[in-house]
């Protein structure tokens, strides 16, 4: 039995999230259907992180166990032949039994691309979030500072969250303006359900001047979801990368898959 890891990219707007559902319109369902068509046997995948409806994947990772002997490029090309244009396997790699797509990961990174312009752009539909009013980047950065570290993030989890604990370690929040865009990067050991979108909602509320920067600290320590801002739209959210120990030599996601992914290539 061989353990195979795959790097997956997908357009989340085309699916009802990652996790398999009875109607079959999820990324997992499409991937496992394609693997079954190629391998001529059912293969069950384990994913690094389940994404919600509308959330995109740039650096998603899965693994599965198989008795089949196939070359790495064969897993890539063969599986892609049965996938829709909205999903693609980027790489395949045999892994030791100790590797686990979810439990071996020590960090996850998400990007959010926000288009700031008086008029929305149809060309960016589902690819970037949109807001029509200018945002105070310095105020958002000041507010974000209180979130760094290990905290109880109950105020930013959804009612459907199945995580055993609301305590997560947020390593980094970067906010970079670029033309008509503001780019956000969130890096943590793990994220709660809707956590990034709820953080985005609060940061945007501060950026619009609805609340002072200190308000976000009050929300964090209040641990009450009702005190936070509404959940922000999923359109501009990307699972950018999953971090693993170097011993596994997991390939890095393909840079430049979307124009704004290169914003972070220098850091």
UniProtKB/Swiss-Prot annotation:
<comment type="similarity">
    <text>Belongs to the tRNA pseudouridine synthase TruA family.</text>
</comment>
<keyword id="KW-0819">tRNA processing</keyword>
<dbReference type="InterPro" id="IPR001406">
    <property type="entry name" value="PsdUridine_synth_TruA"/>
</dbReference>
<dbReference type="InterPro" id="IPR020094">
    <property type="entry name" value="TruA/RsuA/RluB/E/F_N"/>
</dbReference>
<dbReference type="InterPro" id="IPR020103">
    <property type="entry name" value="PsdUridine_synth_cat_dom_sf"/>
</dbReference>
<dbReference type="InterPro" id="IPR020095">
    <property type="entry name" value="PsdUridine_synth_TruA_C"/>
</dbReference>
<feature type="binding site">
    <location>
        <position position="110"/>
    </location>
    <ligand>
        <name>substrate</name>
    </ligand>
</feature>
<dbReference type="GO" id="GO:0031119">
    <property type="term" value="P:tRNA pseudouridine synthesis"/>
</dbReference>
<comment type="function">
    <text>Formation of pseudouridine at positions 38, 39 and 40 in the anticodon stem and loop of transfer RNAs.</text>
</comment>
<dbReference type="Pfam" id="PF01416">
    <property type="entry name" value="PseudoU_synth_1"/>
</dbReference>
<dbReference type="InterPro" id="IPR020097">
    <property type="entry name" value="PsdUridine_synth_TruA_a/b_dom"/>
</dbReference>
<keyword id="KW-0413">Isomerase</keyword>
<feature type="active site" description="Nucleophile">
    <location>
        <position position="52"/>
    </location>
</feature>
<dbReference type="GO" id="GO:0160147">
    <property type="term" value="F:tRNA pseudouridine(38-40) synthase activity"/>
</dbReference>
<protein>
    <recommendedName>
        <fullName>tRNA pseudouridine synthase A</fullName>
        <ecNumber>5.4.99.12</ecNumber>
    </recommendedName>
</protein>
<dbReference type="GO" id="GO:0003723">
    <property type="term" value="F:RNA binding"/>
</dbReference>
<comment type="subunit">
    <text>Homodimer.</text>
</comment>
């Amino acid at each position: 039995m061989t353990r195979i890891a795959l790097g997956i990219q997908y357009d989340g707007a085309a699916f009802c999230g990652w996790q398999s559902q009875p109607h079959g319109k999820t990324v997992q369902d499409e991937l496992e259907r394609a693997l079954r068509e190629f391998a001529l046997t059912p293969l069950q995948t384990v994913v690094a992180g389940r994404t919600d409806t509308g959330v995109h994947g740039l650096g998603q990772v899965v693994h599965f166990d198989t008795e089949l002997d196939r070359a790495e490029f064969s897993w890539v090309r063969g599986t892609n032949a049965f996938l829709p244009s909205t999903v693609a396997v980027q790489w395949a790699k045999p892994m030791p039994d100790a590797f686990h797509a979810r439990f071996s990961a020590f960090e996850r990174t998400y990007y959010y691309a926000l288009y700031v312009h008086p008029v929305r752009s149809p060309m960016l539909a589902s690819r970037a979030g949109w807001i029509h009013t200018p945002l105070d980047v310095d105020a958002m950065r000041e507010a974000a500072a209180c979130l760094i570290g290990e905290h109880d993030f109950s105020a930013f989890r959804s009612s459907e969250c199945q995580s055993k604990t609301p305590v997560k370690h947020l390593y980094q929040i970067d906010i970079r303006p670029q033309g008509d865009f503001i780019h956000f990067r969130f890096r943590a050991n793990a994220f709660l359900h809707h956590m990034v979108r709820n953080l985005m909602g609060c940061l945007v509320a501060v950026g619009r001047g609805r609340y002072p920067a200190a308000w976000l600290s009050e929300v964090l320590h209040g641990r009450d979801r009702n005190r936070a801002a509404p959940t922000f739209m999923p359109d501009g959210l990307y699972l950018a990368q999953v971090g693993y120990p170097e011993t596994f030599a997991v390939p890095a996601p393909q840079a430049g898959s979307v124009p704004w992914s290169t914003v972070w290539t220098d850091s």
